[in-house]
Amino acid sequence: MSLLVTGGVGFVGSHFVRAAVEAGRRVIILDDLSGSAAGGAAAAQSDCQAEGAAIARILALPGVTLQVGDIGDSALVESLCRTHHVTAMLHFAGKIQVGESVRRPELHFDVNFARALSLLEAVRHAGVGQVVFSSTAAVYGTPDQVPIAESARCEPDSPYGRSKRAFEWALMSAEVAHGIKWAALRYFNAAGAHPDGTMREAHHPETHLIPLALDAALGKGPPLSIFGSDYPTADGTCVRDYIHVCDLAAAHLLALRELEHGRSLGPLNLGTGTGYSVRQVLDAAADVVGRPVPQGLAPRRAGDPAQLVADASAARQRLGFAPVRSDLRVLLEDALRSRRHG
């Protein structure tokens, strides 16, 4: 019996694959490599080499198979599930850039909803009855209050958030109609890296604050742009709840265990309950690196709420989940180690 992991070459997906293998699971990765340096349009050769090495390390793990392909290819998905006796799917694949979703909403609805719906139908036809979905705190939009509980109103500010929310509705309906057991894990801000330094965050193009800040401080990237300094927060910059990618991987295994015991979970927040502003993160990054982060101000990005901080109590109560590496300094130190290693 195996797990189908879509997007298993990506940042969160690859960390999950490693955790799953260490827990004794067999994994089939389905990934089109579009988010990797190799699949990017304009990635530096050093990025391609570092990421290629990271992918090779994942594929060298026992019990891991990579199938390069599209999640919307129903025949391929169904064949993979039947051939490898897949019992559950972890769905990480998708478009994640908020700004891009505002410019190209059709792309996000195509990948994050339409193709994901084809994927869901294909695995269901192959007899797969459990789905853990990589959702997002962006489904909440601008919250009425923080921290944000799962019961909060969902009015996403971006097509990215709307496309993710749409697939949550599809999973909810699939449970009613077909008995699918599911969890939609609403990440707040995934960050950090495996503490051994061999796996790092790498999006192409990179849009996440922590890798951009560290690369700027290390002289590996341009000065960091602070998008908006007039938000209704203590220092005028956006506030986010950062959770370590290894903690996210552990939470997925806990959620999978619940589904395998016949307990559907629905939506669950994955965060720490503590928010940090952009300026606070930059100050902490400078302290960890030992040099300032070159930076400048830029206009707000469309679709960015002022604050996103999790009420993480439901995951603690229902999964027994408690982050262990999500202290901001630990998270930054792990991320820095991976960027120096790479």
What kind of region is each of these model predictions?
Residues L66, E78, L90, Q97, ...:
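Generic anion/oxyanion-binding catalytic loop in active/binding sites
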